[in-house]
UniProtKB/Swiss-Prot annotation:
Propeptide section residues: 28-33
Naturally occurring in which organism (per UniProt): Cyriopagopus schmidti (Chinese bird spider)
Alphabetically ordered keywords of this record: Disulfide bond, Protease inhibitor, Secreted, Serine protease inhibitor, Signal
The protein's name in its UniProt record: Kunitz-type U15-theraphotoxin-Hs1d
Family in the record: Belongs to the venom Kunitz-type family. 03 (sub-Kunitz) subfamily.
GO CC term (a single one): extracellular space
Record-annotated site: Reactive bond for chymotrypsin: 47-48
Location in or out of the cell: Secreted
Taxonomic lineage: Eukaryota, Metazoa, Ecdysozoa, Arthropoda, Chelicerata
Amino acid sequence: MGTARFLSAVLLLSVLLMVTFPALLSAEYHDGRVDICSLPSDSGDCLRFFEMWYFDGTTCTKFVYGGYGGNGNRFPTEKACMKRCVKA
């Protein structure tokens, strides 16, 4: 049973890396930290329906968030998105 658990853990880690790594490659970094406003929109892993906002590189755009997962480029309001991502 121990081998099966180990293989399951390795498989889960592999899937998480395959999902996360491309998003990190597309992100911009400032002072060694990911700039969340440069991440792509990500609706997450669930099928719920929440209207959220993300920064598309130019402006804040509405999208549907599933309720779990995703990345930091997700804001509850357009105002919150603009405040965080739009440079004055």
